[in-house]
């Protein structure tokens, strides 16, 4: 598993129910573009605002709709046994892997985090990608990642939404001890850098609305066209300004999708709120800049 994996937004109707027609359109759009993986129940997908049964339903529908790409399901929770049930469910529906964020809300020691992931790995026989996002959840120390990778063969990699090259570099050292361990960035702006360091790809939110730039970076890198890859990486860094403008990942990405004319409503589940017209106009300027740039390069 490698390349460009998309942590999907969860489209909602005005009444906050899941819009499965929009989900179907979105997955078809992404697969037609050629992304390597589809990931439901993600941070960008507002998984914390979904009920337990909705998480299962969304996972099932995503599996049904994904036919070309790898299919990943987020199964994270603050409850270890709920994680086990969701992870077993992901296996039962035929997911290729699960992505499990470290427990959030309560601060945990490294020993507790190690035990949490170990219990899940022992009881759920499916490939597991750890998910480190210290801005939202307990951080996962690199030594804990190393121990988990060496002790559990079904823990196959990590998604690191961590703004630190040092952390990424230390994760890549785990690959030296376990060659098949995968390291993905969760931050669009680190995608090219991680590839140059020996990483395996990215699980990145901007790929919801601009997958072509991520795929062009991936292809240029694989073809050793590094000058082109660097140019594209700089464009991607500029696009990520939407995160600073908006109040949440989901708001930023959904407004960018609306700006591009996608059939996605600008609706977030409470307690999240969609940003207003001023923020939307700023995001639209960034999206239109990228579209104009692409036309000029054709």
Curated annotation (Swiss-Prot):
Subunit (UniProt): Homotetramer.
Gene name, Swiss-Prot/TrEMBL: dapAL
Active site: 43 (charge relay system), 105 (charge relay system), 131 (proton donor), 159 (schiff-base intermediate with substrate)
GO molecular function terms listed in the Swiss-Prot or TrEMBL record: 2-dehydro-3-deoxy-phosphogluconate aldolase activity; 4-hydroxy-tetrahydrodipicolinate synthase activity
Record-given protein name: Uncharacterized DapA-like lyase PF0657
Keywords, comma-separated and alphabetical: Cytoplasm, Lyase, Schiff base
InterPro entries tied to this protein: Aldolase_TIM, DapA-like, Schiff_base-form_aldolases_AS
UniProt lineage: Archaea, Methanobacteriati, Methanobacteriota, Thermococci, Thermococcales
EC number of the protein: 4.-.-.-
Compartmental location: Cytoplasm
Gene Ontology cellular component terms for the protein in this record: cytoplasm
CDD domains: DHDPS-like
């Amino acid at each position: 598993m490698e390349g460009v994996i998309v942590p999907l937004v969860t489209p909602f109707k005005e009444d906050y129910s899941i819009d499965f027609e929009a989900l179907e359109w979105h997955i078809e759009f992404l697969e037609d573009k050629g992304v390597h993986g589809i990931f439901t129940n993600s941070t960008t997908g507002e998984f914390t605002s979904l009920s337990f049964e909705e998480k299962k339903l969304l996972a099932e529908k995503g599996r049904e709709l994904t036919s070309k790409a790898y299919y990943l399901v987020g199964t994270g929770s603050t409850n270890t046994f709920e994680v086990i049930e969701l992870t077993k469910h992901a296996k039962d529906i035929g997911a290729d892997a699960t992505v499990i964020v470290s427990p959030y809300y309560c601060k945990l020691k490294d020993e507790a985090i190690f035990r949490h992931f170990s219990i899940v790995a022992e009881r759920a026989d499916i490939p597991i990608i750890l998910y480190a996002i210290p801005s939202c959840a307990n951080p996962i120390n690199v030594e804990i990642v190393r121990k988990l990778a060496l002790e559990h063969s079904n823990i196959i990699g990590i998604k690191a939404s961590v703004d630190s090259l040092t952390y990424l570099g230390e994760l890549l050292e785990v690959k030296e001890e376990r060659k098949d361990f995968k390291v993905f960035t969760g931050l669009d702006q680190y995608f090219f850098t991680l590839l140059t360091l020996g990483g395996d790809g990215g699980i990145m939110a901007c790929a919801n609305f601009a997958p072509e730039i991520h795929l062009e970076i991936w292809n240029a890198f694989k073809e050793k066209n590094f000058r082109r890859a660097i140019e594209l990486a700089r464009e991607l860094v500029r696009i990520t300004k939407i995160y600073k403008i908006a109040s949440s990942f989901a708001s930023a990405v959904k407004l960018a999708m609306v700006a591009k004319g996608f059939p996605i409503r600008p609706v977030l589940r409470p307690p999240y709120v969609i940003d207003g017209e001023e923020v939307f106009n700023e995001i639209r300027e960034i999206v239109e800049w990228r579209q104009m740039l692409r036309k000029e390069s054709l």
